[in-house]
């Protein structure tokens, strides 16, 4: 079966969207089913509104439900992305029921490979448990 150019191009796209449930996300449903997008990126704050908790993230259970449903409507496995760097750049905040995530700068100052690995593993576990498989966290961040 041949895949149309439109659907091939769709695989190159990762789209943000508004809504915490699929019922609120008609645009992204169309992007996934009609255009075969490669993934989505999740945010907690809608910058136009400027208030935390107004975009895609409300709680760990809500987030897992959303990511499961997004995967279930897609023909292919979606990249489900987030910016969960820790410190100032964190989407999974304590106010939503997640643990505080220290910044990588703080972890670097500790200069302890065991703590660094534990921190990495902790972030990976939280993301995995929420159905998130792509973290746009910095590999190298110079301040």
Residue ranges, per PLM feature:
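Short gly/ser/thr-rich secondary-structure transition/capping motifs
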Residues: 22-23, 83
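Enzymes and membrane/adaptor proteins characterized by extended Gly/Ser/Thr/Asp/Glu-rich
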Residues: 36-143
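N-terminal glycine-rich anion-binding loops that anchor highly charged ligand groups
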Residues: 7, 29-42
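Alpha-helical scaffolding within the catalytic cores
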Residues: 23-29
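Boundary/entry segment of secreted carbohydrate-active catalytic domains
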Residues: 1-22
């Amino acid at each position: 079966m041949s895949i149309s150019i439109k659907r091939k191009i769709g695989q190159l796209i990762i789209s943000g969207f508004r809504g915490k449930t699929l019922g609120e996300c008609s645009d992204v449903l169309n992007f996934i089913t009609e255009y075969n997008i490669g993934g989505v990126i999740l945010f907690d704050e809608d910058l136009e509104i400027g208030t935390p908790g107004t975009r895609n993230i409300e709680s760990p259970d809500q987030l897992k439900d959303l990511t499961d449903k997004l995967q279930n409507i897609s023909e292919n496995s979606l990249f489900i992305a987030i910016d969960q760097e820790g410190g100032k750049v964190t989407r999974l905040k304590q106010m939503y029921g997640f643990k505080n995530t220290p910044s990588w700068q703080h972890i670097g100052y500790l200069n302890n490979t065991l703590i660094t690995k534990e921190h990495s593993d902790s972030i990976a576990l939280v993301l995995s448990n929420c159905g998130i498989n792509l973290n746009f966290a910095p590999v190298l961040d110079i301040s």
